[in-house]
Design a protein with these regions (language model features):
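Generic detector of low-complexity/intrinsically disordered segments
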Residues: 25, 69-71, 91
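Extracellular jelly-roll beta-sandwich "head" domains, especially the C-terminal globular C1q domain
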Residues: 76-104
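Exposed extracellular interaction/assembly regions and N-terminal maturation sites
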Residues: 1-64, 94-104
Length: 104
């Protein structure tokens, strides 16, 4: 079956249709936003991957919920370096964890 791809979605807010998919960026810097649970109640276990095959960084932002950087525990917007890859997983109704190469 594989992992469906959304190619160069631009500045983008995650939707329910993105569960199990990957966003593939090959051009300019963009921002991917994870919506607040109060705006879009995605299920616990929802996950998506970002592949940044561009020569610039991509931001991964979160609105009012919490985005934890795996292995560190810091919260907030993350930066995915050029040619980096990251996976985000919803772990509670208002918490996500993210990990990957080139992620700060």
């Amino acid at each position: 079956m594989g992992m469906p791809q959304n190619t160069n979605p631009g500045t983008y807010t995650i939707t329910a249709a993105d569960n199990g998919k990957h966003l593939y960026y090959t051009t300019t810097a963009q921002t991917v936003t994870i919506p607040a649970n109060g705006t879009l109640a995605l299920p616990i276990g929802f996950s998506f991957v970002i592949v940044n095959a561009a020569a610039v960084s991509t931001s991964i932002a979160i609105t009012t919920d919490t985005l934890l950087l795996a292995g560190v525990g810091t919260t907030g917007t993350r930066t995915l370096a050029a040619y980096g890859m990251a996976t985000a997983l919803k772990i509670t109704s208002t918490s996500w964890i993210i990990s990957g190469n080139g992620l700060t």
